Amino acid sequence: MNFELTEEQKMMVDAVKRFVDKDSPITRFRQMRTTETGWEPKVWKTMADNGWLAVSFPEDHGGYGGNFVDTSLILEQLGRGLVPEPYIASVVLAGGLLSRLGTPAQLEKFLAPMLEGRTSLAFAYAERQGRYETSDCETAATKSGAGYTLRGEKVWVLNGHAADAFVVVARTSGASRDASGLSLFLVDADAPGLKRIRVPGMDGHSTGLLKLDGVEVAGDRLLGEEGSALASIEWALDRGAAAACAEAQGELQTLLTLTVEYLKQRKQFGKAIGSFQALQHRASDMFAEVELCKGMMILAAIQADSANDLERKSAISAAKVQLQQGGWYVQENSVQLFGGIAITDEQDVGLYFKRIRVLQGLFGDADWHLGRYSSLPGFEGAAA
């Protein structure tokens, strides 16, 4: 398998890297995390003008016909500067579902403005009792004339505090954990009966708590077929997990770079602590884990576009496990090698540490993905 980037991909990576270095270094993230939205519409528009929002969408949907590897390359660079714009929420999750299931009218109204950087989107799927089980949904959508009435609550909605519209998971039939009966609806942020509350996160990003109290949606706001959304939800969350691995890769690499630089500068007993062999071994092990995460991230990005559900699920679950296990080794050792200053807000190490920790838990933690991986067909035979 050829992992070499095309010339177009190399140019794109260089452009995103220059953008992060010049226009969105970590100092900008420090400023943005104290604002109401946590990101800037003008920067979102710049990203759209550069083609980074539309790169992986089909040309007939307003995109450039790229693939998920292109998306991952962008996210890896954005992770270096902790760029706060809602790329995963808008582009990967909600945008991906619209591209997969949307009618021409829905694409024109919701996807096109987002790809142009004029709006942002969010995917509201998680509920308090759900953990990581995608079929666990108590939000109900009942028939109301030619449309539907939505009632329920959604938690941890990425970009939910700032989005212009939502893709909402609601149950149109069945019990709360049935695999069938789940549907997707397009809901405007200003819809009567919809209340959203901003919830600050430990990583400096905010999410939204959505309360739907009799939200009326027209029949043309149903995204895809009624009662058959589970496969698309799983597909979207898998791509979200692959995207989390890609963003975290940029952050892990930066964490390693910061740590190695500190080992060269910090002196003890009259010499740089990086000259001590024991710490060199520790840094070497950190490098190995970062590279393992990168290899698994690349495979997950490739398989995110696979039509084979087994290949997609196995590659992405494996990458997510490596991110949590190998990534944690990098995180804890960066803190230990820096010492107490690493956990202060003034030190960038702590900001990367917290963001990676959030990404490790998004879309399934290591325990959940290990469980899914071991349950996939062929696992027992492969182990034997």
Which ranges hold each PLM region?
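Short Ser/Thr-interspersed hydrophobic loop/turn segments at strand-loop and sheet-helix junctions
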Residues: 51, 75-79, 170, 187-191, ...
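Flexible, small-/acidic-enriched active-site or ligand-binding loops
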Residues: 132, 136-138, 187-219
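Short Gly/Pro-enriched turn/cap motifs at secondary-structure boundaries
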Residues: 87, 129-132, 156-159, 175-176, ...
